[in-house]
Amino acid sequence: MEQPSVESLLELRRFPRKQLSLILLLLYSPLGLCLFLIRLFIGAHVFLVSCVLPDSVFRRFLLRVMSSVLGVYVSHSALRPLERRGKILICNHRTDFDHNIISLIAPCCSPSLSCAPGFLCWARGFLELGALGSRTQLMESLKHYLSQPGGGPLLLFPEEETTSGRTGLLHFSSWPFSLSDSVQPLTLTVQRPLVAAAVSGCSWVTELFWLLFIPFTVYQVRWLPPVTRHTRESDEEFAFRVQQMMAGSLGVAATRHTGADRAEYLKRRRTELPRSAPRSVPLSPTQMQMAQHVKEVLPQVPLSAIHRDLGHTGCIDTTITNFLEGRVTFLPEEETLGGNEATERTPLDRISRPLPRGFAKSPEVRHLSLQERKEALYECARRKYLEKFGSVGREEEEKGARG
């Protein structure tokens, strides 16, 4: 079975594709903003209650009731007795508030892998372990926490990053499974109307806004049977076996993509999107004529690239120089028409016809420096331009520069 791509594991769109859903969201927006402000005030009281009351069944019940006012509804299967659940809870990662949701139905603590220790880390409900410099220090701190009498179970997310939960699970890290020979897996699904439950790469503040803005969000928790390590089973094998079990319960694939693959994909996507949709610069009729002059001299350069550079320079000579010296990259029109591989090339890959392509017979030509070749290319293009347009182009350049 072919494993899903990294892109399919992520939620990249906040808003729905259907026009009807977009219209409903637009009509709901005024009510949603009012609801957000009211819930923000109520949420402050929920935070105070969670700080004042000690961890108990009554506190969790009260917080669940108050959370329902915030539009957060939690349903779960029959809760297993504490002695059968174990000290390590393993869950898939859907949103930035998964640890808060699960703590409403079971006593547990979750360490943060990204939030720096301090007030914000404590206020978000994470377990503070001090400044952690490495994964080894984290594991030592967690082992010390587990050895303390009266300490609650640890809730860990081996995926380490959130996913859409629709197609697959990220590859489980092995370090959570080195803490104990028995773990308690549980699965989490999230449903929300009108918008996505969470968008990959967004901050937790943005997700909090949408949590309070949308009418309701339903979290469903399902407890799975405890899993014990087999004899001579390594941490990696143990982690993969639990991953397959949880993926089967969710009806998704257990992939080999890691959190680092997810981060790399999001980084590449952020850099590629602006490049794929460049903003067009409006040109005057004079600049349009100047672009045609450049096109006559450099026929391989597409007009879109010429327009873009002329919008910045306003000068024919400067634009020609930019293309000849490789300051502006473009896709030559000969490649586009021929259907060859669509990769960006610098003009020096194409506009080199005035000079011999093979091994020159003359020693002088063979020893031309790169700068001399550029100057030769520039002079050739300039000569072709002057032969075609003479002083007319110079006048239009001056008009364009004054405009």
Curated annotation (Swiss-Prot):
Residues 1-21, 43-399 are cytoplasmic. It is a peripheral membrane protein. Keywords: Endoplasmic reticulum, Lipid droplet, Membrane. It is found in: Endoplasmic reticulum membrane; Lipid droplet. It holds the Pfam family CUE. The keyword Endoplasmic reticulum applies. Residues 22-42 dip into the membrane without crossing it. GO terms for molecular function: ubiquitin binding. The keyword Membrane applies. Residues 286-328 form the CUE domain. PROSITE patterns: CUE. Belongs to the AUP1 family. Plays a role in the translocation of terminally misfolded proteins from the endoplasmic reticulum lumen to the cytoplasm and their degradation by the proteasome. Plays a role in lipid droplet formation. Induces lipid droplet clustering. This is Lipid droplet-regulating VLDL assembly factor AUP1. It comes from Xenopus tropicalis (Western clawed frog). The gene is aup1.
